[in-house]
C-alpha cells in the first residue's frame, strides 16, 4: 500500500520546500513556501484483474499537491513549475518500500487557483501514482 505519509516524505526529498513546510491533510496556519499533500477522490471501477486481487499486480493512488508559496506571482509560479518538472522527469522511483511503476500527471501544467485570503499564490498539481501491489 502506498501511504500519504510516504508520498509526503518523497516530496520533502525533492528539496523544493523545507521538511516542516510539507503537510498532509489540512494546512492549518499555512506558512509561506509550503506544499500540501492530499488524497484525491476518483471515480470509476477499481483495478482488479481476472481472478481477483491475488492476480492484480498494481493499484492507483490519486494525489493532489497544493503549492502555497508567497505573495509574488512569478516566484510562486516558478516553484510550482519546478515541482511539476521534477515529477515529470522522474525515471525510476520507489517510495518507502513500494515500487512506483508510473506517475501519471493529470493536468498539463500546474493549475493556478489564485490566492488565499492573505494574498499568497497557490497552484495545484493532480497526479496518480501507479504502484506495485504486494
Model-found features: residue ranges?
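Small/polar-rich, solvent-exposed N-terminal microdomains that initiate assembly or binding
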Residues: 1-53, 90-94
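Residues in well-ordered beta-strands of folded domains
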Residues: 23-25, 38-39, 66, 106, ...
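Short, cysteine-centered beta-strand-loop-beta hairpins and adjacent loop/turn segments enriched
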Residues: 46-47, 71, 133-134
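Short, solvent-exposed beta-strand/turn "edge" segments of beta-rich domains on protein surfaces
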Residues: 52-57, 116-118
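A short glycine/small-residue-enriched secondary-structure motif
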Residues: 55-61, 100-103
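Oligomerization/assembly interface segments of phage tail-like spikes and tubes
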Residues: 57-71, 121-131
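Mid-chain, well-packed structural core segment of small domains
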Residues: 69-91
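Acidic-leaning, charged glycine-interspersed low-complexity segments
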Residues: 88-133
Amino acid at each position: 500500500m502506498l501511504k500519504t505519509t510516504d508520498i509526503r516524505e518523497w516530496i520533502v526529498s525533492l528539496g523544493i520546500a523545507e521538511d516542516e513546510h510539507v503537510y498532509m491533510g489540512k494546512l492549518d496556519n499555512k506558512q509561506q513556501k509550503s506544499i500540501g499533500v492530499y488524497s484525491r477522490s476518483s471515480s470509476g471501477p477499481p483495478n482488479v484483474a481476472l481472478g481477483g486481487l491475488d492476480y492484480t499486480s498494481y493499484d492507483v493512488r490519486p494525489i493532489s499537491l497544493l503549492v502555497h508559496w508567497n505573495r509574488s506571482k512569478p516566484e510562486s509560479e516558478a516553484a510550482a513549475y519546478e515541482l511539476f518538472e521534477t515529477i515529470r522527469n522522474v525515471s525510476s522511483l520507489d517510495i518507502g518500500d513500494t515500487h512506483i511503476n508510473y506517475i501519471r500527471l493529470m493536468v498539463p501544467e500546474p493549475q493556478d487557483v489564485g490566492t488565499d485570503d492573505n494574498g499568497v499564490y497557490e497552484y495545484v498539481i493532480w497526479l496518480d501514482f501507479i504502484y506495485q501491489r504486494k
